[in-house]
Amino acid sequence: MRLHERFRSPAAIKGDAEIAWWLRVWDPIVRAGGFSPGDVQQLLDGEPPADSYQGRRWQLARAEVRRVLREANIEDPSFFHEKVVVDIGPGPLGFPDACPARVSIGVEPLAQRFADARLLLDSHAVYLAARAEAVPLVSNTVDVIVARNSLDHVDDPRAAIAEARRLLRPGGTLILNFDVEHTPTPTEPHALDADEVRSWLSAMTIAHEDVWDHPHGHDGHAVVLVARQP
């Protein structure tokens, strides 16, 4: 191992691995004419695949908005309208870009690297190159926070939840979707426990909970929690 690699932080190593996956695995699928995730057409009611790369990217983004609502058991398609919505760790999937919010924000520590790689869509969304544990936004100013398949990627999951609660207005909604009981990896270093995550929500009201039989990653399984701020 080269000397400089030995002294690099775990966060830097994790970031390199994240970027490599998006560039070497995810983006080639889209450029080859596919979708990743592969259920985009079902979520878009059978809409035929777009002819262009950018068109497919926007289809992925719009499907991601529908996916979040469906998984959270939110039937109102206008749920995000006129709200301030924050997505924690969106990557380049495009949820912040397609979300029909009054203000749509992606908190993504790799935002600049995604932009440099031309993986971010051109939209009105704001991407903050910030950690989930220290978001540069004022307390009690956000209506909805989404963290889909990102809680086990952050540096400190409990601190990320505390930060989300700081940001939410009274009555605000936190939508979590995360793997539990999985083997830690360089990009997903935390083996989360559903009961422990619930304990971090403390005074919040659980509005919806779902336990999947499959994971986002390689093993374990996913849990969906939708919680309301008091």
Model regions: which residues?
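Core SAM-dependent methyltransferase catalytic element
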Residues: 210-230
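Class I SAM-dependent methyltransferase Rossmann-like catalytic core
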Residues: 2-79
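A short SAM/SAH-binding and catalytic strip from SAM-dependent methyltransferases
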Residues: 144-155
